[in-house]
């Protein structure tokens, strides 16, 4: 504002453009900064709001794409998992070139960048069944993170979901899994990008599902999301 006030329009435009990337695009929006801020400023929450206020044709396309992803969420993690497993056997350079072209065409917010470290995809959460852990009456509702469907364990590891289930078995506790677990997500992919419409769609679905699974709040909810 000061640069514009003194007629330095070009400087003002360069600063605004730089801030888009350095101040908004690269913010983790995890609100961890508030834990050490002496005056309790939550920059993550502020940046989420700024992202939701972006305008333009490209942004509208991105919002529509993320809203569509929320509606079709049972398929999205499954497709991502299958894609990762499939490309894992292809030459890394070829896959990276294809995703680079796709990112240039549809935008980096829609098409993620492929890295060979991603490994293979995971398995559907519904394969767990409606109960995990030890036999008996469930003491809580377990919501495995959808990220474990998209990304499988690294190397010879068992993955977060299988480790959580094994822990429940050893502890001798029974956990209930929502019937429509494949359609659920914590909402972070939408809130972190300021995609309010897509988040509202997912929020409504998760609330309805967990109200039923928890017996209207009687059971607590556990998740392996970090």
Segments the model singles out, each with a brief description of its role:
Residues 1-3:
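Glycine-rich phosphate/ribose-binding loops and adjacent secondary-structure elements
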Residues 6-183, 190-226:
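Iron-sulfur-cluster electron-transfer modules
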């Amino acid at each position: 504002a000061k640069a514009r006030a003194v007629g330095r329009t070009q400087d003002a435009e360069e600063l605004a453009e730089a801030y888009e990337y350095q101040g908004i695009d690269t913010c983790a929006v995890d609100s961890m900064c508030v834990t050490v801020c002496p005056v309790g400023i939550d920059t993550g929450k502020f940046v989420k709001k700024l992202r939701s206020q972006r305008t333009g044709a490209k942004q509208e396309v991105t919002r529509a794409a993320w809203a569509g992803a929320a509606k079709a969420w049972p398929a999205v993690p499954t497709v991502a998992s299958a894609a990762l497993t499939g490309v894992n056997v292809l030459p890394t350079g070829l896959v990276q070139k294809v995703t680079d072209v796709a990112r240039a065409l549809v935008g980096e917010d829609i098409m993620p960048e492929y890295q060979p470290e991603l490994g293979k995809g995971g398995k559907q959460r519904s394969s767990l069944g409606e109960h995990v852990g030890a036999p008996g009456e469930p003491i809580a509702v377990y919501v495995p993170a959808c990220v474990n469907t998209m990304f499988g364990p690294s190397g010879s590891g068992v993955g977060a979901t299988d480790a959580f289930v094994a822990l429940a078995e050893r502890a001798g506790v029974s956990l209930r899994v929502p019937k429509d677990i494949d359609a659920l997500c914590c909402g972070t992919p939408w809130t972190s990008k300021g995609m309010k419409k897509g988040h509202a769609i997912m929020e409504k679905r998760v609330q309805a599902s967990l109200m039923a699974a928890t017996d209207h709040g009687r059971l607590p909810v556990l998740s392996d999301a970090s």
